């Protein structure tokens, strides 16, 4: 048990260093927060974070995406025009596809936890090295589900 603790801590430290070296605040902060939680009595909250963290993250992301509508930065006129421009219609179609893939990804990650480690490593590498954003595991899992037929 103690050996597993140290292995997981080392992995988090490596992720923290990768985040620092790549100047990626999301990876750096996430790894740092998880290290603090892991080495303090806050670790009792890991089951809650594991059960609800993904949904909370999606909620926060959705709030961020909808904020331009709520603040008025994206006008009603712009929203209506998005239904008549070819580029916007393609964007809507891609948004639908990505949301569908994300849904498949959540199901796959829940039903086949053995793929989660690979998806996370790929996502963290993409975030740290390619300056991506950490929405990758859901989409990657959705794409994987298409390839493996799940």
Curated annotation (Swiss-Prot):
Membrane topology qualifier: Multi-pass membrane protein
Transmembrane segments: 1-21, 45-65, 83-103, 115-135
InterPro entries for this protein: UPF0756_TM (IPR007382)
Subcellular location(s) of the protein: Cell membrane
Highest taxon of the lineage: Bacteria
The keyword Heme appears for this protein: no
GO CC terms, sorted: plasma membrane
Pfam families: DUF441
Keywords: Cell membrane, Membrane, Transmembrane, Transmembrane helix
Family annotation (HAMAP family): UPF0756
Record family assignment: Belongs to the UPF0756 family.
Protein name: UPF0756 membrane protein ACICU_02320
């Amino acid at each position: 048990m103690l050996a597993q603790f140290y292995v997981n801590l080392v992995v988090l430290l490596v992720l923290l260093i990768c985040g620092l070296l790549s100047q990626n605040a999301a990876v750096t902060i996430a790894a740092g927060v998880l290290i603090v939680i892991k080495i303090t009595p806050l670790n009792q909250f890991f089951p809650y974070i594991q059960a609800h963290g993904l949904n909370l993250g999606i909620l926060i992301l959705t709030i961020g995406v909808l904020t331009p509508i709520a603040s008025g930065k994206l006008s009603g006129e712009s929203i209506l025009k998005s239904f008549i421009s070819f580029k916007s219609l393609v964007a809507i179609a891609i948004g639908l596809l990505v949301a569908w893939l994300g849904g498949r990804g959540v199901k796959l990650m829940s039903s086949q936890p053995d793929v989660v480690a690979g998806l996370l490593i790929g996502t963290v590498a993409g975030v740290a090295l390619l300056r991506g954003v950490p929405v990758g595991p859901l989409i990657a899992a959705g794409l994987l589900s298409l390839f493996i037929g799940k």
